[in-house]
């Protein structure tokens, strides 16, 4: 084998190893759940802010924990807050990147004040839900179809459902809109999807 061919093969191997290492680094940096040093502390939906709404969300006496098992076997958790007066309207919320149900407290309180039942799930790999990677809405869309089914099972077939998402959660509800949804889903609100 001539010398230049050996150098070329060695160069290709080094470049391939470098690309694989870079890919693994960036996968772990962005997709694996955990503390992210690149997230600005003011990024909407990425941290729990001490507000009156946050205290209400955490301490509401009617707060319930709901759970489902995803199609791929993950245990997913959510916080359910029934409306103060019996209501057949439920909003299902979707938080942003590295957020959790609690980071949606301001929006949860707003919908609750409007007379909605509120369901705030932790996306896979976030909060109390299981998951080894962040799906950026794609696998989560199927989870939200299951959350819709859970609301209908728990609250009845007369329920009118709104999906509301912020940032990555907005991407989630947009992707959910492409699935076969029951007629009970009356509105889908995406707040700043893909802008962050």
Write out the residue ranges for each language-model feature.
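Primarily recognizes the serine-hydrolase "nucleophile elbow" in alpha/beta-hydrolase
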Residues: 150-154, 159-196
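The serine-hydrolase catalytic nucleophile loop
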Residues: 97-110
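N-terminal Sec-pathway targeting helices
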Residues: 1-17
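Conserved alpha/beta-hydrolase
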Residues: 108-130
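Short beta-strand element of the alpha/beta-hydrolase
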Residues: 88-96
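An N-terminal hydrophobic leader/cap segment in hydrolases
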Residues: 14-69
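A short loop-to-beta-strand scaffold at the N-terminal edge of the catalytic core in hydrolase folds
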Residues: 71-82
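Alpha/beta-hydrolase active-site loop
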Residues: 134-155
